[in-house]
Amino acid sequence: MRLILFTNSNRLCNEKQKTAGKKIMIETDVVIIGAGPCGLFTVFELGLLDMRCHLIDILDKPGGQCAELYPEKPIYDIPAYPVITGQELTDRLIEQIEPFHPVFHFGQMAESLEKSEDGKWILTTDLGTSIKATCIVIAAGGGSFVPKKPPIP
């Protein structure tokens, strides 16, 4: 399995590389915000079209709420699986996208998005990672894991 993980965490799998906090511009075809089941399946669909994907997620691992909140809970509405747990679903999706070599940026949150002069998008994370892509997919899931407090004095 060849997954490349960029993270602000010290828990890295496979290739130990870090970009967080370094001022570099990564270029790819698609940036997917969210590495839950929808984000992972998006990698598969885009991979079939030979598109390179980078995923941004605030969590330190793929799977979103399925893996983080209820990894052992049975899920009954996934096609071709009468019953599957949240972690099993995540594991199957990771296995399915392996041939497309997605790049994960864990422990980072999308902070800004702007259009460049050449018409592509530049996404910057809260840790300063910048990724230039033709397309941005928002697969942020059912809710944020980081509470946003209102600016009350």
Predicted regions located by residue number:
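Gly/Ser/Thr-rich beta-alpha loop segments that engage phosphate groups in nucleotides
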Residues: 36-41, 65-66, 143-145
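Generic structural signal for well-ordered secondary structure
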Residues: 59, 71, 90, 138-139
